[in-house]
């Protein structure tokens, strides 16, 4: 921030601060943002772990609220210097309706932007997603791409559609005059597949393996690579972006950045086994054990069952047409834009990230070997 802000302690607001990424952003701010005076944590469901944070030198204010309620968002934003908007509904399994996904991800983001404009908060960092870009509905690979790589971003699934629209709203808002007449400065960060402590989907895969007797069966060719990024490094990138957004407003304002680190490019299944293997699971098959057409059929069948059962019961299997398409499409990024624009370097090495994640899976599932 500018010199005028250096003398004062700053007020940060993290929306979705009790979510998977949000909790890591909150803890990272407390550890590594020396100018922090007050940290507001806004979420619909407040975690009990927040209480332990209230004994430190920084004032931690827990605010229970809903991003779809404009008045609640405006009250939380008022007086904040910086907003890190991580709140969002990540649902690729059909647990929520398309309407709910849109309300949270799009209307919620619109509410945050309007709250910044109305209250005079000038700096907004938005958590976007790689799925704003792809994989697209045509299954086109994105191989070692960067923020400027041409790619036909065509989506039908409610989640990537909602994130794409929300990101557009954030970038379009850059430069809008806020209360007091100064411009709003925004940027968006696009994590690839996030892993690490608190990753619910990793836990779901572990439980699925247990139900199958400790085995997981290869469904996707090992040659289909995915870029993954450790949650601690994603949180660190958010902290750095928020810190530098004022001094580098001309450079960073209205920009998007892929989140990246030293995690290796591997297939989704092979990457997961880096953590699930030490927890006792085994991946069967050097090649997929089922033909792809059969997976397509099973995914379509799951989608049909989900539609038929929706009035009666929630049926949200891991395999559906969208998750199959994503898992079966190469999507890797290779960029240094965040380093060039605001000095980002990964805080955690691959070895450290891997160890931390393994220990979490073992502790969370009681599977320590």
UniProtKB/Swiss-Prot annotation:
Residues forming the catalytic site: 159 (proton acceptor)
TM region positions: 289-309, 311-331
Membrane topology recorded in Swiss-Prot or TrEMBL: Multi-pass membrane protein
Main location: endoplasmic reticulum
Catalytic activity: 7alpha-hydroxycholesterol + NAD(+) = 7alpha-hydroxycholest-4-en-3-one + NADH + H(+); 7alpha,25-dihydroxycholesterol + NAD(+) = 7alpha,25-dihydroxy-4-cholesten-3-one + NADH + H(+); (25R)-cholest-5-en-3beta,7alpha,26-triol + NAD(+) = (25R)-7alpha,26-dihydroxycholest-4-en-3-one + NADH + H(+); (24S)-7alpha-dihydroxycholesterol + NAD(+) = (24S)-7alpha,24-dihydroxycholest-4-en-3-one + NADH + H(+)
E.C. number: 1.1.1.-, 1.1.1.181
Molecular functions per Gene Ontology: 3-beta-hydroxy-Delta5-steroid dehydrogenase (NAD+) activity; cholest-5-ene-3-beta,7-alpha-diol 3-beta-dehydrogenase activity; oxidoreductase activity, acting on the CH-OH group of donors, NAD or NADP as acceptor
Pfam families registered for this protein in UniProt: 3Beta_HSD (PF01073)
Protein location: Endoplasmic reticulum membrane
Highest taxon of source: Eukaryota
GO-annotated biological processes: B cell chemotaxis; bile acid biosynthetic process; steroid biosynthetic process
GO cellular component terms attached to this protein's record: endoplasmic reticulum membrane; lipid droplet
Disease per record: Congenital bile acid synthesis defect 1: A primary defect in bile synthesis leading to progressive liver disease. Clinical features include neonatal jaundice, severe intrahepatic cholestasis, cirrhosis.
Family: Belongs to the 3-beta-HSD family.
PANTHER family: 3 BETA-HYDROXYSTEROID DEHYDROGENASE TYPE 7, NAD DEPENDENT EPIMERASE/DEHYDRATASE
Function as written in the Swiss-Prot or TrEMBL entry: The 3-beta-HSD enzymatic system plays a crucial role in the biosynthesis of all classes of hormonal steroids. HSD VII is active against four 7-alpha-hydroxylated sterols. Does not metabolize several different C(19/21) steroids as substrates. Involved in bile acid synthesis. Plays a key role in cell positioning and movement in lymphoid tissues by mediating degradation of 7-alpha,25-dihydroxycholesterol (7-alpha,25-OHC): 7-alpha,25-OHC acts as a ligand for the G protein-coupled receptor GPR183/EBI2, a chemotactic receptor for a number of lymphoid cells.
Stated name of the protein: 3 beta-hydroxysteroid dehydrogenase type 7
Species lineage: Eukaryota, Metazoa, Chordata, Craniata, Vertebrata
């Amino acid at each position: 921030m500018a010199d005028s802000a250096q003398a004062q302690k700053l007020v940060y607001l993290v929306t979705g601060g009790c979510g998977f990424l949000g909790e890591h952003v909150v803890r990272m701010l407390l550890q590594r943002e020396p100018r922090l005076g007050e940290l507001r944590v806004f979420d619909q469901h407040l975690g009990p772990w927040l209480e332990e944070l209230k004994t430190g030198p920084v004032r931690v204010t827990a605010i229970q609220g809903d991003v779809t309620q404009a008045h609640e968002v405006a009250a939380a934003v008022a007086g904040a210097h910086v907003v890190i908007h991580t709140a969002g509904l990540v649902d690729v399994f059909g647990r929520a309706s398309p309407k709910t996904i849109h309300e949270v991800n799009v209307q919620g983001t619109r509410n945050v932007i309007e709250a910044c404009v109305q209250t005079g908060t000038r700096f907004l960092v938005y958590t976007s997603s790689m799925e704003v870009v792809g994989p697209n509905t045509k299954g086109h690979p994105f191989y070692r791409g960067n923020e400027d790589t041409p790619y036909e971003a065509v989506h039908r699934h409610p989640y990537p559609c909602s994130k794409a629209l929300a990101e557009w709203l954030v970038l379009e808002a850059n430069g809008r005059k806020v209360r007091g007449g100064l411009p709003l400065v925004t940027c968006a960060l696009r994590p690839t597949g996030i892993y690490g402590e608190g990753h619910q989907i990793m836990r779901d895969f572990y439980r699925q393996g247990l139900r199958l007797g400790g085995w997981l069966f290869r469904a996707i060719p090992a040659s289909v690579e995915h870029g993954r990024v450790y949650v601690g490094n994603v949180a660190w990138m958010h902290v750095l972006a928020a810190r530098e957004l004022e001094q580098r407003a001309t450079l960073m304002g209205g920009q998007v950045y892929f989140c990246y680190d030293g995690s290796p490019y591997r297939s989704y299944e092979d990457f997961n086994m880096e953590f699930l293997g030490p927890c006792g699971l085994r991946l069967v098959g050097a090649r997929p054990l089922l033909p792809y057409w059969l997976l397509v059929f099973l995914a379509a069948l799951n989608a049909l069952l989900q539609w038929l059962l929706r009035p009666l019961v929630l049926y949200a299997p891991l395999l559906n047409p969208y998750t199959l398409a994503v898992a079966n499409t190469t999507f890797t990024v290779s960029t240094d834009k965040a380093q060039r624009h605001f000095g980002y370097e990964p805080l955690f090495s691959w070895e450290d990230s891997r160890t931390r994640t393994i220990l979490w899976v073992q502790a969370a599932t009681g599977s320590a070997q």
